[in-house]
Each structure stands twice: as structure tokens, then as C-alpha cells.
Swiss-Prot record:
The lineage of its organism: Bacteria, Pseudomonadati, Pseudomonadota, Betaproteobacteria, Burkholderiales. It catalyses: (2R)-2,3-dihydroxy-3-methylbutanoate = 3-methyl-2-oxobutanoate + H2O; (2R,3R)-2,3-dihydroxy-3-methylpentanoate = (S)-3-methyl-2-oxopentanoate + H2O. One of its GO terms (molecular function) is magnesium ion binding. Functions in the biosynthesis of branched-chain amino acids. Catalyzes the dehydration of (2R,3R)-2,3-dihydroxy-3-methylpentanoate (2,3-dihydroxy-3-methylvalerate) into 2-oxo-3-methylpentanoate (2-oxo-3-methylvalerate) and of (2R)-2,3-dihydroxy-3-methylbutanoate (2,3-dihydroxyisovalerate) into 2-oxo-3-methylbutanoate (2-oxoisovalerate), the penultimate precursor to L-isoleucine and L-valine, respectively. This is Dihydroxy-acid dehydratase. GO terms for cellular component: cytosol. The active site is at S522 (proton acceptor). Binds 1 [2Fe-2S] cluster per subunit. This cluster acts as a Lewis acid cofactor. The modification N6-carboxylysine is found at K124. Its cofactor is [2Fe-2S] cluster; Mg(2+). [2Fe-2S] cluster binds at C122, C201.
């Protein structure tokens, strides 16, 4: 029977000093026999996805204490990718994932906490906390702040001049701002309407993708990824998480039940999560994060597994930015993540024996929470929770219900396998002489007409140069924009490329151009945008050998990407580059701090999840 970790600092005569300090935090005699639960919050006023979390840690804490535990809250950092984007602030986003994981490890191990409730929401916070959970391997429940309501406005179509009702998100604000056909007044209207409430941005972007994947991993409660941040139903998720973690802690420490530990989800849960990701056309960043989380868990889940799954899993859900018809609030109305998992289960694509924090197995969870099979009216009522359309930064401030559920599996937001949006899923891994270790593309956002595309390389040595060239109309139809030395090591920090892809779209080149980078993309990206090219240029990857005018062929159906240059010519270029050193050909006015330089020294390429190369730390 494992001993409570907290006994290290609360039991025995020698710990009198530590207990004295614990008492100064409010603990009493009777508390020293209870599990100490860390409430890991990520409240910050910098991030709309986290601005409403301030009091929610104490909401969870009250439930923990009512269930017989001791709750102790602390905070991690949180970077807003949208605000950090388009300038050197984005260099810090991906590295912050590792800082978050480390900070959780430091606090939990330093104070010998027995279990955790992780209150996350946005892009790097959920994966950072998941990495920490796997590293620590103590009982954990995740609960997110929830998605933002989609924005809504009426806007004049710049071509037809008719007034159109439009659902909006952050990406619309970026695209319209770069489109000269819209007036300053139009841009201002969209800016004020695109992000109306607290919560993670309203499409299937990285934050929402990751919060949905925690459901498939079995580490959060049903609805975690989809019920909007403003809805009263989300309050119940926080309360249930607080009660549940005390039960899980007791099952592990008092009953020796290792199935409650996060690593017990095993390889099967990672396959389930990736299967869901492919089926819902999630952000390509999820690939990066799942690979990193699997490494922390000691699970051999690789790009090869992702490639294998991408060939057989259909796309069953299509949400912004891949369509302007649906947002996350619409996924919830259709039954949420449990409904997508239910359709995948009927297709034989899930491991339903994987454990969850709220049911013995995923199969048991689906029996209760899949709205197409449940007999529980409370579940159906839960999935009718909808947006109120009232701008607010207050959590749980409304109780609006959709008039009906979306149960249309032929033409609705969530489809059955027989009526899938596409037979192959929304993410794919490509390989070729330009990406020997692979690169990734969100096929859900690529028009079928350019699934096979051959174009001319337009080489840039940074995101800034790419943006400058696109806005100056130097990028033409048929070009493939190369953005290199933006990988984890070369950036450093692996910047997101949402601005260049948004500007390509605003220039009317969304179906006529491609972009290839060793950097990454925002979950808001769509179009033929191929990222995570590995090895990256700074690590000697062939993307660093491409020259202006080279022809490049992209073949998504056959999962290939090649620069159409002979092996002999590539070898000649490699020898030349080896002599010069693998650095950008043009100087970049970029401030790289000591912290970022330290990150660059240890980080590996994207195909390994951009995690640290721990072999470099061996004596």
C-alpha cells in the first residue's frame, strides 16, 4: 500500500517545524491525516481564456475540503498566443509549456502533495500540465476554463454589398484586417465582436483541441472541452472535479488502485486521443503536445502511430477554422466529445477498455454520456447548454439552452462514419526528401482541389520576412512559401505562423499557394499550411537546402512532400551549408534572451514533440 506522499512533511516528531508552517496556512490537527490536494490554477488577467479563473480554484478547494481532503492552491504562468503572436513574444510560447510542467513538478514535489486538480485552458497550459501529471504520476483530474462563445455581427459583403450575419472568431479579425476590401469601420466592428466573452478562442484551435483530448485521454470529465465558459453547467464540472479527486486519492493510497494514476491510461488512451484529434480536425499543435506528453509518460507513441491512424480514421466533425458554419458551442449541442467518441466506437476505432477518472472504462462512460445511446435525460439536458450572446468576463453567468439537440448524423456538426466529412481524417503526416522525419498538415482545412500541389519555392529566413513579402504582393499564385529557421532550436521557440497564413488568405491566395515551415501553426490556421518540418533547418534539415525557384511537390493522398532536385545537387548544397553553418542566410533583428538560448541548447525537433534532449544532461 503506497504511503501518502504528504506524510513526508506532516508525520513524525522531526517534522514539527514543517507542521508548524502548515498550521500557519490554516491546517489543524485533524487535517494532518487527510490527503493534501494541490489545486493547480492558471489564472491571469493577460489571457481571456484564464481571466475568469481567479475564484475557481477556491471553488474546487471548497469541494475538496467538503469531501475530506485538504486543498492548497498555487498558480502557474499562462501565455496568450494570440497576443504574443506577430512579434518576438511568440518565441516564448512553446518554451512556456516546459516552464509550466517544471513549475508544477517543483511545487508538488517540494510540498509533497498527494494529488492534483489542474485548472487549465489555453494553448500551452493544458499540455504543460499534462506533461507534469505524467511526470509526477499521482492522481489528477483536469478541468478547463471552457471555450469562448463565438462572436456574431452583421457585416457588408465587400463584393455583393449585401448585409450578412456572420459568426466570428479571432482568425476573422486577423483576415479581415489584412483585406483591403474592408473599411476601417468594418475592421473595428469585427475586432469588437470576434471575442465576446471569457474563455478559450471559440473554434477548434489548439486550446479547445487539447481540452477535448483530455476527455479522450480519460483525465477530465465529460463536457470539459465543449461547454462554454459562461454557462452555469461548467460550475458543476469544477465542483465534481473537487469531489472526485479526493475519491481517486483514497483509491490509490488506501486501496492500492493504480488504475487511478495518469500513466495507467497507457498507449490505448493515446491512440484514442489521436483518433479523436484526427476525426475532429484538431490543431496540428496537438501532435506536438501528445508526443511530448507520451514521452513524459514513458509511452512509445510516435509519428509513425499518428501516420498510421491518419490513414484509417475518417473526419466526423468540422469546426472553425475549417468551416465558418460551426464553432465549439455547436459541437456541444451535438453531444460534445462523447458523441464523436461514440461514433468512433461504432466504427470500431476506439479502445473502450481504457480507464477514465470518472468511469471504470471509456466504454462505461460512453454508455452514459453518448447522447445517441444514453437513457439519461440529465445528460441530454447538459448537452443543450448554449451561448447567451452577452459579452462578459464572468464565468457561469448564464443558463441558456438550445431549443433542441443536433442529432443529425448525416448533415449535422458531428457525422456518422457513413456520412463522414471525408473518409480520411483531418490531420496527416507527410514525408519526403525535404522532411525525412516528417511534417504535418491539417487536411481538414485544405481545399480538396490542392491536395496535390506542385509549386515554386519562395524562400524566407523568418516569419517576419514571409509576412513582409506576402503583404508586398511578392508572393504569387503557384508559390510555396518556405519559412525556415523557425523551429524549436532555430527560432528559438518554434513560432506559430497564423499571420502569414491569414495574410495569404486575405490576398485571395488560399487555394493557390502553400506554406512550408519548420515552425508551427496556430490552431486557427487553414489552407495548405505544412508545419513541423523535421529535422528543422537549424538541426541540418533539408528545408535549409531549398533555394528560390526550386519546384516542390506536395501529395497529401500519398503522404509525400519532395523538393524536385537531384540527390547529387542536394548533397552539394549540404556540403556547402555544412561549411557555412546552419544559420539564416540573412541577419534577423531578433532579441534572443539567455532563457531562450538555454531552451535552444536542449530542445529536439518537432517529430520528438520538441521536448528536451535529456541525453545531453547525462554525465
Amino acid at each position: 500500500m503506497p504511503a501518502y506522499r504528504s506524510k513526508t512533511s506532516t508525520a513524525g516528531r522531526n517534522m514539527a517545524g514543517a507542521r508548524s508552517l502548515w498550521r500557519a496556512t490554516g491546517m489543524k490537527d485533524e487535517d494532518f491525516s487527510k490527503p493534501i490536494i494541490a489545486v493547480v490554477n492558471s489564472f491571469t488577467q493577460f489571457v481571456p481564456g484564464h481571466v475568469h479563473l481567479k475564484d475557481l480554484g477556491q471553488l474546487v478547494a471548497r469541494e475538496i475540503e467538503a469531501a475530506g481532503g485538504v486543498a492548497k492552491e498555487f498558480n502557474t504562468i499562462a501565455v496568450d498566443d494570440g497576443i504574443a503572436m506577430g512579434h518576438d513574444g511568440m518565441l516564448y510560447s512553446l518554451p512556456s509549456r516546459d516552464i509550466i510542467a517544471d513549475s508544477v513538478e517543483y511545487m508538488v514535489n517540494a510540498h509533497c502533495a498527494d494529488a492534483m486538480v489542474c485548472i487549465s485552458n489555453c494553448d500551452k497550459i493544458t499540455p504543460g500540465m499534462l506533461m507534469a501529471a505524467m511526470r509526477l504520476n499521482i492522481p489528477v483530474v483536469f478541468v478547463s476554463g471552457g471555450p469562448m462563445e463565438a462572436g456574431k455581427t452583421r457585416l457588408a459583403n465587400p463584393v455583393t454589398k449585401t448585409i450578412e450575419f456572420k459568426k466570428l472568431d479571432l482568425v476573422d479579425a486577423m483576415v479581415i484586417a489584412a483585406d483591403d476590401k474592408y473599411s476601417d469601420a468594418d475592421v473595428a466592428e469585427v475586432e469588437r465582436s470576434a471575442c465576446p466573452t471569457c474563455g478559450s478562442c471559440s473554434g477548434m484551435f489548439t486550446a479547445n483541441s487539447m481540452n477535448c483530448l483530455t476527455e479522450a485521454l480519460g483525465l477530465s470529465l465529460p463536457g470539459n472541452g465543449t461547454v462554454v465558459a459562461t454557462h452555469a453547467d461548467r460550475e458543476q464540472l469544477f465542483k465534481r472535479a473537487g469531489r472526485r479527486i479526493v475519491e481517486l486519492a483514497r483509491r490509490y493510497y488506501e486501496q492500492d488502485d493504480e488504475r487511478v494514476l495518469p500513466r495507467s491510461v497507457g498507449f490505448k488512451a493515446f491512440e484514442n486521443a489521436m483518433t479523436l484529434d484526427i476525426a475532429m480536425g484538431g490543431s496540428t499543435n496537438t501532435i506536438l503536445h501528445l508526443l511530448a506528453i507520451a514521452q513524459e509518460a514513458g509511452i512509445d507513441f510516435t509519428m509513425a502511430d499518428i501516420d498510421r491512424l491518419s490513414r484509417v480514421v475518417p473526419q466526423l466533425c468540422k469546426v472553425a477554422p475549417n468551416t465558418n458554419k460551426y464553432h465549439i458551442e455547436d459541437v456541444h449541442r451535438a453531444g460534445g466529445i462523447m458523441a464523436i467518441l461514440g461514433e468512433l466506437d461504432r466504427a470500431g476505432r476506439l479502445h473502450t477498455d481504457a480507464p477514465t477518472v470518472h468511469a471504470p472504462t471509456l466504454g462505461d462512460a460512453l454508455a452514459q454520456w453518448d447522447i445517441t445511446r444514453t437513457q439519461d435525460e440529465a445528460v441530454r439536458h447538459f448537452y443543450m447548454a448554449g451561448p447567451a450572446g452577452i459579452p462578459t468576463q464572468v464565468a457561469f453567468s448564464q443558463n441558456t439552452r438550445w431549443p433542441s439537440l443536433d442529432l443529425d448524423r448525416a448533415e449535422g456538426c458531428i457525422r456518422s462514419v457513413e456520412h463522414a466529412f471525408s473518409k480520411e481524417g483531418g490531420l496527416a503526416v507527410l514525408r519526403g526528401n525535404i522532411a525525412l522525419d516528417g511534417c504535418v498538415v491539417k487536411t481538414a482545412g485544405v481545399d480538396e482541389s490542392i491536395h496535390v500541389f506542385e509549386g515554386t519555392a519562395h524562400v524566407t529566413e523568418s516569419q517576419d520576412e514571409a509576412v513582409e513579402n506576402i503583404l508586398a504582393d511578392k508572393v504569387k499564385a503557384g508559390d510555396i512559401v518556405i519559412v525556415r529557421y523557425e523551429g524549436p532550436k532555430g527560432g528559438p521557440g518554434m513560432q506559430e505562423m497564423l499571420y502569414p497564413t491569414s495574410y495569404i488568405k486575405s490576398k485571395g491566395l488560399g487555394k493557390a499557394c502553400a506554406l512550408l515551415t519548420d515552425g508551427r501553426f496556430s490552431g486557427g490556421t487553414s489552407g495548405l499550411s505544412i508545419g513541423h518540418c523535421s529535422p528543422e533547418a537549424a538541426a541540418g534539415g533539408a528545408i535549409g537546402l531549398v533555394q528560390n525557384g526550386d519546384r516542390i511537390r506536395i501529395d497529401i493522398p500519398n503522404r509525400t512532400i519532395d523538393v524536385l532536385v537531384s540527390d547529387e545537387e542536394l548533397a552539394r548544397r549540404r556540403a556547402e551549408q555544412d561549411a557555412k553553418g546552419w544559420k539564416p542566410a540573412k541577419p534577423r533583428p531578433r532579441k534572443v534572451s539567455a532563457a531562450l538560448k538555454a531552451y535552444a541548447k536542449l530542445v529536439m525537433s518537432a517529430d520528438k514533440g520538441a521536448v528536451r534532449d535529456l541525453s545531453l544532461l547525462d554525465d
